[in-house]
A protein has these predicted regions:
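Conserved donor NDP-sugar-binding/catalytic core segment of glycosyltransferases
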Residues: 47-86
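A short, conserved alpha-helix in the catalytic core of glycosyltransferases
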Residues: 112, 116-117, 123-128, 134-162, ...
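Glycine-rich, basic loop-to-helix element that forms the pyrophosphate-binding segment
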Residues: 12-30
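Acidic donor-binding segment of Leloir-type glycosyltransferases
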Residues: 1-14, 256
Length: 336
């Protein structure tokens, strides 16, 4: 490429860095005041960047509206229209898409964020960009969106600027999208083993950092419950329960043999930057201690654990003790 404005980074390996790392390296070498996170399977529609510039301000993150083929469930934050799932299909339908763009413009904005998104470079670097905890990929986007939200950034999605997003590229669907003989697109159960493994790893690290699953409203604005300092004190624990419960708290106590704990740490530590030895069976004075019997843990009880941050927030907890379901909760301090 001979364009003097084009800059690129090449990872010669052997370690896969992924976009969690490489996005930030690209931002670092960018010499423009505004930067954007953009997927390689997106087609920038005419007028899109002009719409970004219309709305960009300090501490504002501007997203374009995605036009997508019906590969994923519909939602109010995007437009489902099929102009092809592969470049070879798209080039035959490109003119049809371009003819549709004027009628798709809505002259409005909504509050949400999804790629492609744009902001001032200073606003990206001031919160240290993406967290390498989630490298090479998965959950790094929700993590940075949460931090934008907590730092008071405003989310703007313009409905006058569009990309056509083919979706389903990269490691999740290594072979791209597929059509059956009837021309219908199918994606279910086609994720690669690599993606499934990394997604599980990143999800567990996201839970350790935030204490809840990824949350957002219907227009993709982040929902960020408070993060409490929580300790689980589990009677009748076992190695499987340790694996299930450890990411959901900051500290966990179980009466387990050292070899069970060591085996878990040996297996799990390679997948996280969190020091697991400082989280398991250590003497600390946690803000919130939750006691329960592992033998009584049901599917419903586990669901309550997954919503613990929201439950504690809605309960307007104070120092003291209370119970719900199988859980006895001691609140020593209330901090988030």
């Amino acid at each position: 490429v001979k364009d003097p404005n084009f800059k690129a980074i090449r990872n010669d390996g052997p370690t896969r860095l992924g976009h969690t790392i490489l996005y930030d390296e690209l931002v670092e070498i960018a010499d423009t005041p505004i930067v954007g996170i953009y997927h390689a399977d997106m087609y920038l529609c005419p007028g899109a960047l002009e719409s970004v510039l219309e709305h960009i301000k300090p501490k504002h993150v501007v997203s374009l509206t995605r036009i997508e083929p019906p590969l994923h469930p519909e939602g109010p934050e995007k437009i489902l229209m099929d102009f092809g799932i592969e470049p070879e299909e798209f080039v035959k339908l490109e003119d049809e898409l371009l003819n549709q763009i004027p009628s798709l413009k809505q002259g409005r904005t909504t509050e949400g964020i999804f790629a492609p998104w744009f902001l001032f470079k200073e606003d990206f670097t001031s919160i240290n960009g993406h967290d390498p905890l989630f490298a090479p990929q998965s959950k790094e986007d929700t993590d940075i969106f949460n931090r934008f939200h907590l730092n008071g950034y405003k989310f703007v999605q313009t409905w006058d600027g569009f990309v056509y997003h083919m979706t389903c590229r990269g490691s999740r669907f290594a072979d791209g999208a597929k059509r059956n003989p009837n021309g219908e697109v199918f994606m279910k159960n086609r994720e690669t083993d690599e993606w499934l493994t990394q997604n599980n790893r990143s999800t567990r690290n996201f839970l350790r950092k935030w204490g809840h699953y990824c949350k957002h409203d219907s227009l993709m604005k982040p929902i960020v419950p408070p993060k409490y300092d929580v300790e689980f004190n589990v009677e009748n624990g076992n190695g499987k329960l340790l694996e299930i419960l450890e990411p959901w708290c900051d500290k966990i106590k179980m009466d387990l043999d050292d070899d069970i704990i060591n085996k878990y740490i040996e297996k799990e530590q390679v997948d996280t930057d969190f020091d697991l030895r400082s989280r398991i069976n250590v003497n600390t004075n946690s803000d919130i201690e939750i006691h329960f019997d592992g033998n009584k843990l049901t599917e419903y009880s586990y669901k309550l654990i997954t919503e613990l941050s929201t439950i504690l927030e809605s309960s307007e907890i104070e120092v003291g003790e209370f119970e719900f379901d199988i859980f006895r909760v001691n609140v020593n301090r209330v901090k988030t």
